[in-house]
């Protein structure tokens, strides 16, 4: 969670109770000068990625955490974060047919995690592979046009 607040913490607590999981936070608090120094240092990227790899469920408000949740085939929800690029998050989730994973911050207290279905990562991978092929073709065509 990049921009923590009481509603997001309540969602994390509700979800961890329902799923019988213990919340684990990866992000540091660099701006909180009253925190111990160990809580203010950002973890290495490798550690951050390992946490995604090992997570059973992810709650985030970060676009990049949403992307890594998809790449690591994780069950997740993302709280819409107006300050952090909500439109790109909506577009990403629409592209992969995961609109139900987006929680409107205004309705966060009404969100019921048990209403979610498991993500069909076979479909997601198919879409992702199509996007990769398209991107690679575009790149190769662009490079070939420059060489002629």
Which role does the model predict for each range below?
Residues 1-148:
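Active-site anion-handling motifs in enzyme catalytic cores
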């Amino acid at each position: 969670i990049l921009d923590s607040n009481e509603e997001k913490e309540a969602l994390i607590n509700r979800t961890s109770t329902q799923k019988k999981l213990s919340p684990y936070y990866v992000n540091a608090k660099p701006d909180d000068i009253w925190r111990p120094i160990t809580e203010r240092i950002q973890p290495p990227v490798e550690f951050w990625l390992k946490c995604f790899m090992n997570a059973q469920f992810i709650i985030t408000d970060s676009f990049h955490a949403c992307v890594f949740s998809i790449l690591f085939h994780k069950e997740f929800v993302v709280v819409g974060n107006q300050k952090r690029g909500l439109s790109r998050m909506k577009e990403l989730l629409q592209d992969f047919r995961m609109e139900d994973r987006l929680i409107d911050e205004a309705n966060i207290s009404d969100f019921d995690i048990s209403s979610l279905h498991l993500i069909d990562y076979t479909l997601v991978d198919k879409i992702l592979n199509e996007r990769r092929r398209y991107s690679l073709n575009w790149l190769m065509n662009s490079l070939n046009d420059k060489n002629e």
